[in-house]
UniProtKB/Swiss-Prot annotation:
Negatively regulates transcription of bacterial ribonucleotide reductase nrd genes and operons by binding to NrdR-boxes. It comes from Pelagibacter ubique (strain HTCC1062). Its cofactor is Zn(2+). This is Transcriptional repressor NrdR. A zinc finger (unnamed) spans 3-33. Belongs to the NrdR family. The gene is nrdR.
């Protein structure tokens, strides 16, 4: 594994254990430069192609999904373990659909539904990008539809 600090490939594994949900192996690594970092090893069940709105296709990228979810969760009271479980559940649910091609709309909807239960603010943040909110009224209309806010 190449160190992200010094870019050398001289690292050793100092700790290895399965993640709590059992879907990956978490490894703590130590580089000769002294840097420590974590890597994850996951099983890829099948190759999934994402069909974009314009019809273009690209391979499903778990890291891209993860980044978009972490952006929505930024500065929210959700710990990394909870976020990783959510990302793993979402990835697994996509694989369990059993389809070789999945629309970006299906993925976005699945993430939104999960975030709705996990953190309402992250849900609105994700929706604002996914649904391409342009003006303040777009946010207001969306939030007005949320049951979470209507109950208050």
């Amino acid at each position: 594994m190449i160190c992200s600090i010094c870019k050398k490939g001289e690292t050793s594994v100092v700790d290895s254990r399965p993640t709590e949900d059992g879907t990956a192996i978490r490894r703590r690594r130590l580089c000769v430069c002294g840097a420590r970092f974590t890597t994850f090893e996951r099983v890829q069940f099948r190759e999934i192609m994402v069909v974009k709105k314009n019809g273009r296709k690209s391979s499903f990228d778990r890291d891209k999904l993860s980044k978009s979810i972490y952006i929505a969760l930024k500065k929210r009271p959700i710990d990394t373990e909870t976020a990783e479980k959510f990302i793993s559940r979402t990835s697994r649910a996509l694989e369990e659909l059993g389809q070789s091609e999945i629309s970006s709309n299906t993925i976005g909807t699945m993430v939104m539904e999960g975030l709705k239960d996990l953190d309402p603010v992250a849900y609105v943040r994700f929706a604002s990008v996914y649904r391409n909110f342009r003006e303040e009224k777009d946010f207001v209309q969306f939030v007005d539809k949320l049951d979470v806010y209507k109950k208050r």
